[in-house]
């Protein structure tokens, strides 16, 4: 499905999220359309995004969109339970969630269990869900969004859970910044100082690079 279709269906003027490779099409589209602006905010974590979304709704009355990888669901539990839920302030929000570790789909080890519990976690937070796959049609998406509008009107949140390869975007975005060092170079400097001291790092590429640097240096991983 073209990501432009999803954008039209969601019909929101405010997006905030944490970039995810599974949602690369959406991330690239938003950078092309909005850049980093009052319409598109990239935050440090998914909880921050949800709080920003709540503030946007309270200020404008417009339903916001929060996008993220499913590994960030744990970070939204507190703001969803304490701010968004219809038993609290009834702030509606649309979540777009990249589904890593989907059962039956090969993925990295850290995504396996998260993928298994993704839909159940959203259900436990009283967030209605719809899974978008390669086979999902435009008509199905519009019909589900029409149903979701009634849910949002009642102050509840909804989530579109996106399978691998479900979204497409034709333009290629070249990312750049003015930082002088790449992440791997920063890690190399940290390892040089800490030597054999234990290091706790986030899952994903940072940990893989840290592992490779320590391997190259003949250091252990205990």
Please report, for each region that a protein language model flagged, where it lies by residue.
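Thiamine diphosphate
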Residues: 1-120, 127, 131-155, 159-222
């Amino acid at each position: 499905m073209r990501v432009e279709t999803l954008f039209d269906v969601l019909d929101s003027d405010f997006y905030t999220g944490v970039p995810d490779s599974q949602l690369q099409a959406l991330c690239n589209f938003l950078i092309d359309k909005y850049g980093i602006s009052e319409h598109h905010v990239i935050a440090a974590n998914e909880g921050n995004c949800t709080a920003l979304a709540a503030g946007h709704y309270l200020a404008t009355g417009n339903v916001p969109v929060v996008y993220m990888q499913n590994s960030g669901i744990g970070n939204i539990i507190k703001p969803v339970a304490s701010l968004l839920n219809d038993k609290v302030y009834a702030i509606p929000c649309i979540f777009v969630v990249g589904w890593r570790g989907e059962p039956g789909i090969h993925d990295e080890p850290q995504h396996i269990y998260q993928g298994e519990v993704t839909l159940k976690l959203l259900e436990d937070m009283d967030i209605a869900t719809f899974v978008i796959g390669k086979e999902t049609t435009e008509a199905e998406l519009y019909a589900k969004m029409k149903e979701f509008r009634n849910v949002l009107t009642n102050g509840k949140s909804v989530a579109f859970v996106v399978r691998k390869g479900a979204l497409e975007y034709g333009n290629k975005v070249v990312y750049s910044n003015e930082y002088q060092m790449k992440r791997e170079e920063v890690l190399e400097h940290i390892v040089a100082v800490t030597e054999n001291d234990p290091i706790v790092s986030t899952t994903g590429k940072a940990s893989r690079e840290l592992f490779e640097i320590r391997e190259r240096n003949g250091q252990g991983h205990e």
